[in-house]
Amino acid sequence: MNIQRAKELSVSAEQANVSFQGMPVMIQHVDESNETARIYEVKNPERELTVPVNSLEEI
């Protein structure tokens, strides 16, 4: 996924179909300077991760 699309999905009111390593996630924040995204698992919202934006897939 590219940074612009990740930013669009992070501010969208709709639930996006995004996955990280096969697990459904939500994007909380995108850090353009580091090209990373703060995400959390849909099934486990307390598990937050910072991952490279290019590791996210829109499904």
Curated annotation (Swiss-Prot):
Compartments, as annotated in UniProt: Spore core
Keyword Nucleotide-binding among record annotations: no
Sorted UniProt keywords: Sporulation
Major localisation: other
Listed GO biological process terms: asexual sporulation; sporulation resulting in formation of a cellular spore
NCBIfam families according to UniProt: SASP_H (TIGR02861)
Full protein name: Small, acid-soluble spore protein H 2
Gene giving rise to this polypeptide: sspH2
